[in-house]
Amino acid sequence: MKEVHKMKVIVFIKQIPDSSDVKLDENGNLIRSGVGTMINPVDKNALELGLALRDRFGGTVSAVTMGPPQAKDVLKRALFMGCDKAVLLSDRIFGGADTLATGYVLSMAAKKLGDFDLAIFGNKASDAETAQTGPVTAGFLGLPLGTSVDALELDGNAIVCRRSFTGGTETSKTALPAVITVTPAVNTPRFMTPANVIDGLKKGITVWNCADLGCDEAKCGVKG
């Protein structure tokens, strides 16, 4: 009988302004103060994929986000979906980070979590749409990358990923550990169940700062 590979999955999620509560100043800039927040929509698909792999093969799913203290809100929602662990990366030093500095900090968090099989990102954030954070993080980790994945299967110690494009599809096999970004087509995110909400309320949120991660301050925030 083929051995079942239990999955240790990290899902990186982002807090974005609630699109139903967007306000602009007189210069057309987004007013973030007092605006509600939500999980970046495609990051819910990333969470669902991680949870589905855990449910099928066993293992754990850790949700990670970088941001101010209020970013705990999206981590609570990840716990309510069924994640096993939630980690907030928060430090004033991280403020003003571009995708390069963000990817560096996220890679340090992945290393601190340790010995993971798969890191999953949504393919882009609705408030920026750079689609760079996942690839940059993979680069810092020195791991293979699959982008815009819309279907995935586990094959022993490897994953088989499919991505679609105009006129066809592409399938590739990648050894684990690996980093992938996913599109909304990969699945339909589950709803929060009362049981998962009750369970999630019992779980704490771990907070790591720059020193906890062992980051080089020169590579973080505006300096990075």
Question: Where are the language model's segments positioned?
Answer:
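N-terminal glycine-rich FAD/FM-binding segment characteristic of electron-transfer flavoproteins
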Residues: 2-224
